[in-house]
């Protein structure tokens, strides 16, 4: 199967090249990047050497579609929407890593991504409704039948997977959910950003986007669908001075305060027992981002505070893999009829 990587020179695109070049089921048919078009790949990315040393090409529908079956859109928010319908009309399947199709309502996207909405005059509410939210562990069947997949954000991935078992079965109350997340600097992308300079963020920890972070509404939308009722929650992201990795600590109120840590661990383990990339750790073993670095694995741990009937769930992912491109490849595998984890590392080279 031929895959076009559109936006190949950002962090998401670079991860896609690295993953697909090792996967016998796929052939990279196009590498797109407007700022670097006309340059040879190996000259710019010698650390991900490609035998045929292809040129990076200008991004256009004709260039993308001439040899591709699937397009991976690794583009900034808003830009993907300028290509998606045209690529679908050409018969390609589309996996979008941006936020353009994560919301079932275009109006909701315009509200949350107002800056992008002012630039990109979209009229594709039908595609927003059609797009499948690409969280493989939750939506595998729908993904297998879809032609447009909207990959989740990194923070939503780290929060929704640990929350889903407890929301879907009514184990926790719908009110009072708090998500405290930490992300490495690569989550900010590859474009220069003063806040991500080593001298600015090194040896420090800071919160950002309190209350109004864009991923809050995305988490709430999907959590509400899982639980069957409207959910509002608190989400606070933090920047930590590591290159990659994400850690989320999630707090909720148990409907049955008599449940123990072992009870909640068994429930979590049973829910994900058929997914090789999800590991539920023993009670009192708490995961580190270092344990999942450069893998598509997600590690989960749960603890109950029986003094107050609260549950604490921990999750760690590599934000560039399970939180981004690794998840896109999971979706590609499902759409193509392959094993979900085909070509994805589930163990890292510790330390």
Curated annotation (Swiss-Prot):
Pfam families: Semialdhyde_dh (PF01118), Semialdhyde_dhC_1 (PF22698). Pathway: Amino-acid biosynthesis; L-arginine biosynthesis; N(2)-acetyl-L-ornithine from L-glutamate: step 3/4. GO terms for cellular component: cytoplasm. It is found in: Cytoplasm. It catalyses: N-acetyl-L-glutamate 5-semialdehyde + phosphate + NADP(+) = N-acetyl-L-glutamyl 5-phosphate + NADPH + H(+). Keywords: Amino-acid biosynthesis, Arginine biosynthesis, Cytoplasm, NADP, Oxidoreductase. PROSITE patterns: ARGC (PS01224). GO terms for molecular function: N-acetyl-gamma-glutamyl-phosphate reductase activity; NAD binding; NADP+ binding. The active site is at residue 154. Its main location: cytoplasm. It is an enzyme of class 1 (oxidoreductase). Belongs to the NAGSA dehydrogenase family. Type 1 subfamily. Catalyzes the NADPH-dependent reduction of N-acetyl-5-glutamyl phosphate to yield N-acetyl-L-glutamate 5-semialdehyde. This is N-acetyl-gamma-glutamyl-phosphate reductase. It comes from Prochlorococcus marinus (strain MIT 9301).
């Amino acid at each position: 199967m031929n895959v076009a990587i559109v936006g190949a020179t950002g962090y998401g695109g670079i991860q896609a090249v690295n993953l697909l070049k090792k996967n016998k089921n796929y052939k990279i048919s196009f590498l797109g990047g407007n700022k670097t078009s006309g340059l040879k790949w190996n000259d710019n990315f010698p650390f991900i050497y490609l035998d045929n040393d292809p040129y990076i090409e200008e991004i256009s529908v004709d260039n993308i579609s001439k040899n591709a079956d699937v397009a991976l859109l690794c583009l900034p928010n808003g830009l993907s929407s300028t290509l998606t319908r045209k690529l679908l009309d050409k018969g390609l399947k589309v996996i979008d890593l941006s936020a353009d199709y994560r919301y079932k309502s275009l109006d909701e996207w315009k509200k949350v991504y107002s800056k992008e909405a002012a630039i990109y005059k979209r009229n594709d509410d039908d595609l927003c409704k059609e797009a499948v939210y690409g969280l493989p562990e939750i939506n595998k069947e729908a993904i297998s039948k879809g032609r447009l997949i909207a990959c989740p954000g990194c923070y939503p991935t780290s929060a929704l997977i640990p929350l889903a078992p407890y929301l879907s079965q009514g184990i926790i109350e719908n009110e009072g959910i708090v998500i405290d997340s930490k992300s490495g600097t690569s989550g900010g992308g590859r474009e220069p950003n003063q806040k991500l300079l080593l001298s600015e963020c090194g040896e420090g920890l800071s919160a950002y986007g309190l209350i109004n972070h864009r991923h809050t509404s995305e988490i709430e939308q999907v959590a509400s669908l899982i639980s069957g009722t409207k959910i509002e929650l608190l989400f606070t992201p933090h920047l930590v001075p590591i290159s990659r990795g994400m850690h989320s600590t999630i707090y909720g109120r148990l409907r049955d305060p008599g449940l123990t840590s072992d009870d909640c661990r068994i429930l979590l383990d049973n829910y994900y027992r058929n997914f090789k990339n999800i590991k539920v750790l023993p009670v009192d073993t708490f995961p580190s981002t270092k344990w999942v670095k450069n893998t598509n694995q997600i590690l989960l741990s749960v603890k109950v505070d029986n003094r107050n009937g609260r549950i604490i769930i921990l999750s760690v992912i590599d934000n560039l893999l399970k939180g981004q491109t690794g998840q896109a490849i999971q979706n590609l595998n499902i759409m193509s009829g392959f094993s979900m984890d085909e070509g994805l590392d589930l163990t890292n080279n510790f330390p």
